[in-house]
């Protein structure tokens, strides 16, 4: 076949796999891997016409687009990490006011400033904060929340998905055990790495604009600086032990959530893409969170109180077992569930926002990553 720079007029790419040769005015019909001229008995392989096709820019564009490989911009690990970061950010911003209220209620039991309960109930706590500090008081600790949730959930979901595959190999017949082990592993990694951020968040949420706290922090980075220089590196890891004990929470929460996702048929397959049922995911995340919170809430009380300022005279707040004893002696069993109702109001929507948005972002990114450009 003779190569030419100017194809015969009206001989371009034709529909139904028809092509035109520069030497023949009649179209060439492409049958699988061969080209057959209608008026010739000779047959040419597709390789014989590659160069003529390349001379036609329009043809090159069409074929290049058709044969282009699937574009996969993100790996599975990257998709999981980004989805977790986005989900944590949305959750933190949405429930920050309730988080402030919960922290105040948890802390007031042993603090001298709160010998007579200063905050009462959910709405009472929120209204008291607004009255004393203005609406901005509801968003104290927002910066460390934003800084904290990004790495926390990014680390958590990444480690969880990896560990889930690992432990399923060890416990192939016991999904609950494998998922619990994966949740504990992920929780330990994220909690240990981000604990300093949550210490700062707790300090900022507890201080008042009135400046009555023993140390007044001007902001997130000022709190980090004062914590490190005035109290030492150990202060950044205050409350880590009860936080690690709180891993029993995720060991209960995530296996139940995984099971409910299947039972509620939260995922379906449509048009070669995965689709999610948001209402069913919300139900699965809410029910699983409620069960886990009821079982493991006392550790949050202990963690919050251990993270308080340590320069209160004769403070016992940095030692776990003396703190448990003092809490029980002064407040009884109900002291371990101080702010529990507020916590449920906060954590159930927070869990729903985090898990549902994680599933949504992951599903969208996975579908986009498998699209043909």
Curated annotation (Swiss-Prot):
The reaction(s) this protein catalyses: dAMP(in) + NAD(+)(out) = dAMP(out) + NAD(+)(in); dGMP(in) + NAD(+)(out) = dGMP(out) + NAD(+)(in); GMP(in) + NAD(+)(out) = GMP(out) + NAD(+)(in); AMP(in) + NAD(+)(out) = AMP(out) + NAD(+)(in)
Keywords: Membrane, Mitochondrion, Mitochondrion inner membrane, Repeat, Transmembrane, Transmembrane helix, Transport
Signal peptide: none
InterPro entries from the UniProt entry: Mit_carrier, Mitochondrial_sb/sol_carrier, Mt_carrier_dom_sf, SLC25A32-like
Gene Ontology cellular component terms for the protein in this record: mitochondrial inner membrane; mitochondrion
Pfam family for this entry, one: Mito_carr
UniProt GO molecular function: NAD transmembrane transporter activity
Entry protein name: Mitochondrial nicotinamide adenine dinucleotide transporter 1
């Amino acid at each position: 076949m003779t190569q030419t720079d100017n194809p015969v007029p009206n001989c371009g790419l034709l529909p139904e796999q028809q092509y035109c040769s520069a030497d023949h005015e009649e179209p060439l019909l492409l049958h699988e891997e061969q080209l057959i001229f209608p008026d010739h008995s000779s047959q040419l392989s597709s390789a014989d016409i590659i160069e003529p096709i390349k001379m036609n820019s329009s043809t090159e564009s069409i074929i290049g687009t058709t044969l282009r490989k699937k574009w996969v911009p993100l790996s599975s690990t990257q998709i999981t990490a980004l989805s977790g970061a986005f989900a944590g950010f949305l959750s933190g911003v949405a429930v920050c006011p309730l988080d402030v209220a919960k922290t105040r209620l948890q802390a007031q039991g042993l603090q001298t400033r709160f010998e007579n309960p200063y905050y009462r109930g959910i709405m009472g706590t929120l209204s008291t904060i607004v009255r004393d500090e203005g609406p901005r008081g509801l968003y104290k600790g927002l910066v460390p929340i934003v800084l904290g949730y990004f790495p926390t959930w990014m680390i958590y979901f990444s480690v969880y998905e990896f560990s889930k595959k690992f432990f399923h190999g060890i416990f192939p017949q016991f999904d609950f055990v494998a998922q619990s082990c994966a949740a504990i592993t992920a929780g330990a990694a994220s909690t240990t790495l981000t604990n300093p951020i949550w210490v700062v968040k707790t300090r900022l949420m507890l201080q008042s604009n009135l400046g009555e706290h023993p140390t007044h922090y001007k902001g997130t980075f000022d709190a980090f600086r004062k914590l490190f220089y005035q109290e030492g590196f150990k202060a950044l890891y205050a409350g880590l032990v009860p936080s690690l004990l709180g891993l029993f929470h995720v060991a209960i929460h995530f296996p139940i959530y995984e099971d409910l996702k299947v039972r509620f048929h939260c995922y379906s397959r449509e048009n070669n893409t995965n689709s999610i049922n948001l209402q069913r995911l919300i139900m699965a995340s809410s029910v699983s969170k409620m069960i886990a919170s009821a079982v493991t809430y006392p550790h949050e009380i202990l963690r919050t109180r251990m993270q308080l300022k340590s320069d209160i005279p004769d403070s016992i707040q940095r030692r776990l077992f003396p703190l448990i004893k003092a809490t029980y002696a002064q407040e009884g069993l109900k002291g371990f569930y101080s702010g529990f109702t507020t916590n449920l109001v906060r954590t159930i929507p927070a869990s729903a926002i985090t898990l549902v948005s994680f599933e949504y972002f992951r599903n969208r990114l996975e579908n986009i990553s498998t699209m043909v450009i």
